[in-house]
Amino acid sequence: MLFSSLTFVWFFLPALALIYYISPGRKLKNGVLLMASLVFYSWGEPRYVVLVVLSILLNYGFGLALDGCGERKGLKKAVFILSILVNLGLLGYFKYFNFFLELAMSLLGRQGFAPRDIALPIGISFYTFQSISYLADTFRGENPAQRNVFRLALYISLFPQILSGPIVKYHELEPQIGDRQESLSMHAYGIKRFVYGLVKKMVFANMFGQVVDRMFDLPLEQLGTVTVWLAVILYSFQIYYDFSGYSDMAIGLDRMFGFTYKENFNYPYLSASVSEFWRRWHISLSTWFRQYLYIPLGGNRKGLARTCVNLFLVFLATGLWHGASMNFICWGVYYGILIVAERLWIGRILEKNPLKFLNHLYTLGEVAVGWLLFRVDTLHNGKILLKAMLIPSKGLWNPRIFADNRILFLLVLAVVFCGPIQQLMPRLKARLFDEENITAADVAVMAALLLLGTLLMVSSTYQAFIYFRF
């Protein structure tokens, strides 16, 4: 079930809100949310809800085992390592088994490899990382093991974030499961954020996505420089509005039920370096890797060389987390090299550069190349398109075939709303994210935007969120 579907917006969500708010007591409300989360997940993946339940039970048992080790550090560490291996093993089987087996067969020179029919369960990368957060926090003693299996189940499976995040660390969410306060203003703000996200998805992401798909389906050798740049720019905005729209919807949904999440995006296309871009893009994933991989590897505490190695490994893991293909591995390597280069010397050049707008152009150019690697089906296709981006060529297709006046108008709006207007008009930004004062004008705007989103849902074809693949 998609957040941007008529079934969810006009049936599932209103029914859940009604049942939730008439349910007395925190335990019953949590029970309603847990059942709704499992129903929500099973709506699209009925067979894999069993995997979610298995993950919950396994991690519940591992948490109790960690707690039961007491001061026996060796045993506790062994249990923790085993728990991580089990979680990564489940993720690895469903997400990486065919990729690594095919890679091994290729290296051994064996032909005729027939991959297994293994479907990727939606959201497995996200709820696996949340489970690891629980285990790591318990192992470190930052929180005791959760002895109520239903509360742990709610943390792992809470429906707003189970499919595509944000990835919420256990020590941030667990206190809210037991003690949170709902209010009319929180619910109203949640609706506002949800509607913002819905419009991002339906108006910008889906519209751009239709054009991008048409362009990438063409014979790539026929695309000229301007056309390729147009495709990459449109995809850059498609993925931003798609994923930030989902995050807005998830944050809004959780706010309706009394939860508070940290922001997952902070206007990444305003960044003046690639390092800054990754502090603003998919913040929950970046902070997860920082806390649970970069710092345990030594962070920046063991000298410059070790810091650079750790940074590179984090981005290699980031690429692999996104998908089982050489594209994503190379995408991670690409960013790893850029981040290390900025740490070694490019960062100093950017700091001393008096023409700061050039820093932004540098960042946007590097990010555009990154999105090209992210979008193409094969590295060979990426090589063809990268050559077209860098070496001027006319191509066989007129860019105006794809960028009609409607798309160009939306592109201008996309540029404005991805950051500049909030920077130039701070009062408007404050109004958009005001949680306390919901005025009649706000209600009217939200109603109009919800109507627009509904009309687009009725008339549009199915387009899943991009990050559902991961």
Language model: regions and residue ranges:
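Membrane-embedded transmembrane alpha-helical bundles that form the catalytic cores
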Residues: 1-469
